[in-house]
């Protein structure tokens, strides 16, 4: 499995108020994208706000995931950027330390924002993701050229 920018905890401390906010403010303005590549924004689309009810559901999901991390035993690649302004900086380390997988890697990037699959280091993300999956598939899933069969 591969996880990008794992949001076990959000960086914004006000996110903890979402269980209350959902009753008085149905929407919360999203922060401005902080991508390091100005061209990357062309690859993203989203609403300018998000429903606070959905944010509250995310908080509940985060609690459940934190409880279940030790049960995850598949190979795991965790990719996170130190410049991510959405996810708490301790989240990827907590996933790495608490997950039950023995085969796990933490890749920290230093020149991308939250949307690291389209930002400046997207090629590193793609290459490391591909390599991680390929090495775990084994030779029977590879064609004669060393790539995944059928690609």
Predicted regions and their residues:
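Active-site nucleophile loop of the alpha/beta-hydrolase fold
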Residues: 2-13
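A catalytic-pocket lid/entrance helix-loop region that shapes and gates access to the active site
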Residues: 16-32
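Short glycine/proline- and acidic residue-enriched helix-loop micro-motifs
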Residues: 35-49
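Active-site nucleophile elbow and catalytic-triad environment of alpha/beta-hydrolase enzymes
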Residues: 51-68, 74
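Short beta-strand/loop motif that positions the catalytic acidic residue
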Residues: 72, 78-80, 84
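Short alpha-helix in the alpha/beta-hydrolase fold that links the catalytic acid
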Residues: 74, 88-97
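Catalytic histidine neighborhood in serine/cysteine hydrolases
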Residues: 93, 97-115
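Catalytic active-site module of serine/aspartate enzymes centered on a nucleophile-bearing elbow/loop
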Residues: 111-151
């Amino acid at each position: 499995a591969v996880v990008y920018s794992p949001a076990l905890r959000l960086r914004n401390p006000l996110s903890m108020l979402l269980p209350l906010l959902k009753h008085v403010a149905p929407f919360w303005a999203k922060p401005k994208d902080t991508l390091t590549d100005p061209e990357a924004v062309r690859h993203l689309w989203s609403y300018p706000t998000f429903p606070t009810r959905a944010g509250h559901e995310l908080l509940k999901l985060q609690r459940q995931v934190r409880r279940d991390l030790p049960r995850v035993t598949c190979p795991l690649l965790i990719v996170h950027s130190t410049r991510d302004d959405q996810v708490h900086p301790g989240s990827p380390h907590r996933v790495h330390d608490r997950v039950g997988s023995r085969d796990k890697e933490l890749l920290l990037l230093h020149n991308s924002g939250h949307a690291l699959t389209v930002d400046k280091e997207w090629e590193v993300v793609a290459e490391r993701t591909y390599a991680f999956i390929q090495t775990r598939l084994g030779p029977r899933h590879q064609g004669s050229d060393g790539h995944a069969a059928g690609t």
